[in-house]
Amino acid sequence: MDEVVFYIAQGDPADKHSQESYGYVTSIHSSKQYASYRQADSHINGTAITGIGPGERIFTAVPNKALINVYSWGKESVDQRIPIPEALTCITLINHPNGSNNNSDNDDNQLYKLPNYRVPWLLAGGSKSGKLYIWELSSGNLLCVRDAHYQGITTIKGSSCGTFLITGGEDARCLVWNLAELISIYDKSDHQVKPYWQITDNTLPLTDLCLNDTHNINDLKLYTTSEDSTVRIYDIVTKSLLTTFILPSSAECITKDPANRALYVGLNNGLVRSIPLYSINSHTSVLESIGGMNKIITVDADQNLKETFVAHQQKTKTGDDKPVVVTKLTISFDGTSIISGDSEGRVFVSDIVTKQVVKSFTPCNSPIAYIAVETVPDDFVNNLATSTTTNKADKKHRMIPQFKRVLASTNSEEHQIFLDIPGKTTATTNATGNIDFATWLQSKQSEELQFKNLSGINSIVKQVGNENVSDLEEKLQRVSQAYTELRNKHEELIKEHAKLLDKLE
């Protein structure tokens, strides 16, 4: 298994047709470049990706144009151009929440194949005018149009549980919405949909936000960055501010450790600062959390660079007085590497422990707008040709319905969606109909080895039984005996040949 990074730039304003703008899919651990996309550019936070591989898509909000470009895997150029009511500055994809009702009468253990045509549930976007749009991808219906902010929306994210949608804007406000209320088009009541929570703690525009991945909604945390040099942590369920970190420079982007051990913040002076969320108490030697209870913590300057990444401060353009700004951040799945992009179009992979750059990617001609990390299997390269052929033959079936410009009808009978229903897969089950534990455990062991194997060499060791070992030993013994007999015969022939030579002399 290999980790790959997808990154895209904002585009050069002088290049009106985006001829010099590209997006790349590159391996983190090797020199492989899996794909590139032409005429690919967007605003910061204006790109969303479903994944890497056949059947996956990339959505980009075209800067200063009322268009969304859709790229399909295996095709470099734009696959679809979807017109929208106005230009969007940020977008996000929301997957449908999994059902929580486990009925014992139903066969919940049945597995299904991955459909060729698959799309997320919703696409949400924010515009420069402060409006919030939500479309259903499988039908193209416009489910929500709302004046959310007084100024432009800069960032938008949805919770993994599908309960909340969070927007941040240039009006220094962060709004938490109940997603079910926003898209309830069949609710005929006259009540006005209001934000679940309005956060007005910041004094300057919000630049980025992120949420922790949790299956328990009570542990859902919100992390925000702002141009007022603050990073704030909120508890969404209790509607409370937990901690405020004050940084020496404006915070432009944020990402977090997969285990919620630390935050990584990109600053407008080219530095990436790590903020630990836990520390060891020097008196009790106990690991304690940092902050909480509305504490305000000032992050001092790191003179020894123990918590700072400085790779982006090195300028490539001489004579330019503008400081380099770290525009986007993300982190690898194991939390050992951080991927960062800056205003000069550079993307670096840095080791979190040593703070050193371990790899740099092909630079873009404009500031980086979006970075995402995904995984691909070991045989991914071998399947590229097959996937390309499949995409060409299945083009009509992979097209997304055009987005509507008016709100969807409140008549539920007019709601039509396009789905690809896959076939069932066979799995090893026991007498009770459940998957055999030994089979499940073996599959998990194989998945673990594939995740650890970051090279193209298959390092999985195959274990054979004792019967096979006995057969192999018996075969080896017979071969060894035959070799000994052949060796003795060869020595006898050499001696006879020597005797004949002596007689001739």
Swiss-Prot record:
Gene Ontology CC: one annotated term: rixosome complex
Coiled-coil blocks: none
Top-level taxon of origin: Eukaryota
SUPFAM superfamilies (alphabetical): WD40 repeat-like
Tagged with keyword Nucleus: yes
Subcellular location: Nucleus
Keyword list, A-Z: Nucleus, Repeat, Ribosome biogenesis, rRNA processing, WD repeat
Positions of WD repeats: 106-145, 148-187, 201-244, 321-362
Entry annotated with the keyword Protein transport: no
PROSITE patterns according to UniProt: WD_REPEATS_1, WD_REPEATS_2, WD_REPEATS_REGION
Gene3D superfamilies (UniProt xref): YVTN repeat-like/Quinoprotein amine dehydrogenase
GO biological process, one term: DNA-templated DNA replication
InterPro entries per record: WD40/YVTN_repeat-like_dom_sf, WD40_repeat_CS, WD40_repeat_dom_sf, WD40_rpt, WDR18/Ipi3/RID3
Function in brief: Component of the RIX1 complex required for processing of ITS2 sequences from 35S pre-rRNA.
Protein family per UniProt: Belongs to the WD repeat IPI3/WDR18 family.
Quaternary state and interactors: Component of the RIX1 complex, composed of IPI1, RIX1/IPI2 and IPI3 in a 1:2:2 stoichiometry. The complex interacts (via RIX1) with MDN1 (via its hexameric AAA ATPase ring) and the pre-60S ribosome particles.
PANTHER family reported for this sequence: WD REPEAT-CONTAINING PROTEIN 18, WD-REPEAT PROTEIN 18
Protein name from the UniProt record: Pre-rRNA-processing protein IPI3
Organism (species): Candida albicans (strain SC5314 / ATCC MYA-2876)
Annotated gene: IPI3
